[in-house]
């Protein structure tokens, strides 16, 4: 049975830290599965017609997290989607009720790799106040146990390309679908 048939239209939610590659990997994965792609941050940006950093600055993180929950609630009512989520989506317990309607995949990227990827990024609102490595370390420490609740953890190295991550994900997904296949 093909992977698409075994998925039965279930959404695939990519979670992980900012800079993990959720958007890039998500687009590739959606294309390979014949699914549509949604980025929750892009939906929020389009809806509010301004960048996330401005939403954070003008309305605060709690208001952003509320928007994020509303978007996830709407997105989860659809099927055949690969969804790239914001890095903090796992912080709200209510969001897990939506995420568990599909398959949750944690793109687990080591701190050193995240720092290398995000060093030049000035758009991330949560990275504006402290040294990058210190702030990312704090965020990762606070979120890691939540990311670990994902159905599947995919460890990513500096050498991995979005294509190799997508390939590994497609190879690993059947291992967690029922009926189980030996992996």
Curated annotation (Swiss-Prot):
Keyword Zinc in annotation: no
Textual note on the cofactor: Binds 1 Mg(2+) ion per subunit.
Keywords: Amino-acid biosynthesis, Aromatic amino acid biosynthesis, ATP-binding, Cytoplasm, Kinase, Magnesium, Metal-binding, Nucleotide-binding, Transferase
GO BP terms in the entry: amino acid biosynthetic process; aromatic amino acid family biosynthetic process; chorismate biosynthetic process
UniProt subcellular location: Cytoplasm
Protein EC: 2.7.1.71
Protein name: Shikimate kinase
Species the sequence originates in: Thermosynechococcus vestitus (strain NIES-2133 / IAM M-273 / BP-1)
Lineage: Bacteria, Bacillati, Cyanobacteriota, Cyanophyceae, Acaryochloridales
